[in-house]
Structures are given as C-alpha cells and as structure tokens.
Amino acid sequence: MNKGKIKQIIGSVMDISFESGNMPEIYNAVEIQTKVNGKDVTITAEVQQHIGDNTVRAISLQSTDGLKRGLEVTDTGIPISVPVGTKTLGRIFNVLGEAIDELGDLPKDVKKMPIHRNAPTYEEIKPKTEIFETGIKVIDLLAPYIKGGKTGLFGGAGVGKTVLIQELINNIAKQHGGFSVFAGVGERTREGNDLWNEMKESGVIDKTVLCFGQMNEPPGARLRVALSALTMAENFRDESGSDILLFVDNIFRFSQAGSEVSALLGRMPSAVGYQPTLSTEMGGLQERITSTTRGSITSVQAIYVPADDLTDPAPATAFTHLDATTVLSRAISEKGIYPAVDPLDSTSRIMNPQIVGEEHYSTAREVQRILQRYKDLQDIIAILGMDELSEDDKILVARARRLEKFLSQPFHVAEQFTGRPGKYVKLEDTIRSFKGIIEGKYDSLPEQAFYMVGSIDEVIEAAKQLKG
C-alpha cells in the first residue's frame, strides 16, 4: 500500500505528498491513523485533485480534529466502499458504510461495493414507461409515479412529508415485495432518529436500509452519502431484480455540500455562488437512478426551495431530472385532508392518454377541472354565499367538496394516530371510484361518507351507516 504524509490541513481539506510514481487515483479513499481524546481513530478522506509536486488534495469525510502535519497517510487503493445486500436491511449506516445504530458490526463476509460507478449503458436501460402504483389515490390518479422514475416532493414543515414517505415504504414492502433505501442528506439528527423509531413501530424497518450524513458532519460526508445509499439501492436492483424505492431527503443539501467542497478546493464559484460543476454532480447522481433490464429504482426526493425561488440554480438543476412532482400544501392539511397533496399543483410526465390510457386521463383531467372551478368560485361563495350560484355551479361545488374529501385516505403507518385501518387502493378501483363521482352517481350520498376511506364501495357502506 502506498504511504504518504500530510503537508497541509485547511478545515476539512488536506494536501498529502506521496512518492513519485505511487500517487493514489482520483476518488481513492485514503486513511489516517491518529488519536483523539486518547482513543485511536481512523479518519478517511477522498482524493479530489492532483495538484503537482507529487501531492494530492483530499477532502475529509470525518472531523479533522486531532490531525497535524507530518502524519502518515495510507492509500487504500480503492474508492469508498459500502456494504450491500440483504444483511444491511434494518440497519443505519454513515457515509463510509459503518453501522451507527449500536446493534453490533456486520458479518465479516458482507459484500462491499465502491460508491463511484458509471450509470447504466443504453443497452441496459429499460425504455418502457410504466406507472408505479403506490396505492395512494391522489398520487395514482393525478400525478402518477413512474417505475424507475424520479419524483420531487415539495413541502414545508409539518404537512406530512415523513408520513407520506413511510407509507410509500410500507406499501412497496407489502404490495411489491421490494426494498427501500433512505438517504438522509444534511438531515437534522432528530428527524433521522424519529424516522427510525417510527419505522420500528410501524414494522417496515426490516425492508429498509437507512444511510445518514447529518447536518453536523463535514461537507464531504454530506456530498457522498447520497452515493453510498444509491450504491446499496443499485445492488438490490441488480441482484434481486425487484423494484427498489430510494428516498433522498434533502436533495438541496447535496448541492449545498457540493458548493462547500468546491469552495474548499479553490474552484471559482459560478452563478449565485454555486459550484461550476453543479450540473455534472447532479447528473452523475440522477443518471444512476433508473430502470434496467434487471429491475428498477424509483426515487422520491424531498426538495427544499431557498426563499421560494424556483429559479435558484440548485432546485432548477434538480427539476430537469424529475418525472413527477408531488406538492404538499399547508392549506389542504389545515382542512384535515391527509395526505395533503395539492391536486392542482402536482404534475407527472406520464399524464398522457397514450401511456395511462384514455379513461384514466379523462377522469383525472375532469377531477382537476371541477376542483379548479371550485377554487375560482371560492371568493363568490365567501362574499355572496352559495345561494347566488347558478344551479350548475351548486352541483359542481357539491361534487368538488366530495372529491376533495375523497382525496383523503387513511394510512397504514398512521393507524396508531387515526384509529382507522390503513387502505391500499388499486389503480383500477381509484379510476372507477372517481369516474362515478364526477358523473354524479353519488351526489345523493352525504359528504362526510367520502372522508378518510379507500374505494367508493366504502363510501356507500359509510353512507348506509350514517343514514341508519
């Protein structure tokens, strides 16, 4: 193994000199043994640049506390490698693939894979576009996810992002028999801890791998943790041939960490202070999230929009890769309608009659038309009251209120809060139910019967109980 010495340390960036002809390759992991508070620790860094004079510039993936000039550095000869396979299920890892859940070390024979690899070739990519059924009515009908596609999840604090993510993990585990990988990129440690505890309570932890690079960690760790999680997901896809769900929360922090690393490496900043390699870094991550002939990775990415400016380079770069957007609205959550997905703001690339079929397309568009008209009439209703509306508009408003309530759904992972058993609604049942409502077949049923149910059959049953 090549040995080198630290020449300079600035924050989490270090320059390391090696002997001529024994230089480590770009992206190789290098290790430094040192003592911190009397304990032996190994600090890992990643080679980023060859700066001449037999010297490399590396970015540390851990705190550089305790490091000093002259310390010996070992080139591992390979990039950062993380454990993969079924032995990782139910565990929490850091960027280096070390278990951080205090449940003991992984077996010695666990397979490891490097986090840097090429995206699938054109021959390996599966070109067919299929709907990814989530069992959540509002998503499947109005902004369907794509198998092997990428969805952006927009939402503020407390509108239900985490619960929606948990329900998707639960549904894919039970209905599709697949695994989920969660990448916490620049996450609050408390949120990661809450998610782990909630997953244990709801019973989905055994089908999930969690990978965290927290807010308090150096930018190198936050930049690479998404790749660590993606590598685990790729192995599940390629080895088990199943549909994998990859959650990234938050993709903005990935770009933010890249910006910090870029500045530390001395690159000239680009627009709004972001790194000049922003598009390349985002593309390198996103292009690996895809369907191949062996299986698919479907990704749901939470996206923070700085100052609500959608033209900011970080979210704007992410948008170009998204196939669907799910917008969570505080106004809808205040009405007690969960999931609080905005039916008019959420979009999907496959909302096309040639892909989803004419019946699905026309039903979804009519639902949106009715809800949009109801939104337009809100001011008139608030000022003049319902009596001033035309007969057609009165019928439309009544129908819209039923649709709005019917877009709510009890979740399996929220059973302990709501007291209602969770519902998974198949796509054909969703289309049939909404088609019946927009055609006026259920105008006579009370509004309350449409709230927090699965398919239309449950509405009819609830209406009987309300009347009885």
Swiss-Prot record:
Disulfide bonds: none
SUPFAM superfamilies for this protein: C-terminal domain of alpha and beta subunits of F1 ATP synthase, N-terminal domain of alpha and beta subunits of F1 ATP synthase, P-loop containing nucleoside triphosphate hydrolases
InterPro entries: AAA+_ATPase, ATP-synt_VA_C, ATP_synth_F1_bsu, ATPase_a/bsu_AS, ATPase_alpha/beta_chains, ATPase_F1/V1/A1_a/bsu_N, ATPase_F1/V1/A1_a/bsu_N_sf, ATPase_F1/V1/A1_a/bsu_nucl-bd
Binding site for ATP: G155, G156, A157, G158, V159, G160, K161, T162
Keyword tRNA-binding on entry: no
UniProt record similarity statement: Belongs to the ATPase alpha/beta chains family.
Record function comment: Produces ATP from ADP in the presence of a proton gradient across the membrane. The catalytic sites are hosted primarily by the beta subunits.
Protein name: ATP synthase subunit beta
Organism: Leptospira biflexa serovar Patoc (strain Patoc 1 / ATCC 23582 / Paris)
